[in-house]
């Protein structure tokens, strides 16, 4: 995959339980940058300039979780590579919001190549923003919650 991506950079922005191990593994690897945690505004700028973002969840742990970085990326008009299970994978695939794959190094690498070369499923920046507004915004979530309450009262 690296040979097909040319001079592309892989930038990790953040923190977390695996941050130090990831930083150690990437030390000395050309084209990999580790940026410590930044403000939400700066993270948005990184996502807006990216070709794609990556979010993952290890299967069998929090399969019900929905990584909010997916929504932050889509709101910036940037496609997502999501490696993991659950509703997020279904949303990415069905909405053509990037690439959903297993948490597998080869599948993630192929997703990166596909989006970098423009061959991955992508609804476009405007379509991604519209999808977030229609399906995962506060307004959309409020409508869904109200429908559940109305149904329970009926």
List the predicted regions and their residue ranges.
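Nucleotide-activated donor-binding/catalytic signature segment of Leloir-type glycosyltransferases, i.e.
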Residues: 5, 9-11, 20-44
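Cofactor-binding loop segments of dinucleotide-utilizing enzymes, especially the Rossmann-like FAD-
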Residues: 13-15, 37, 85, 103
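Nucleotide-sugar-dependent
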Residues: 39-46, 53-71, 81-91
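A charged, aromatic-enriched C-terminal amphipathic alpha-helix characteristic of glycosyltransferases
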Residues: 45, 103, 120-150
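A short alpha->beta transition loop at the rim of the catalytic pocket in nucleotide-sugar-dependent
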Residues: 51, 77-78
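Short alpha-helix at the nucleotide-sugar/activated-sugar donor binding site of glycosyltransferases
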Residues: 74
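Conserved acidic donor-binding segment of nucleotide-sugar-dependent glycosyltransferases
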Residues: 94-106, 114-120
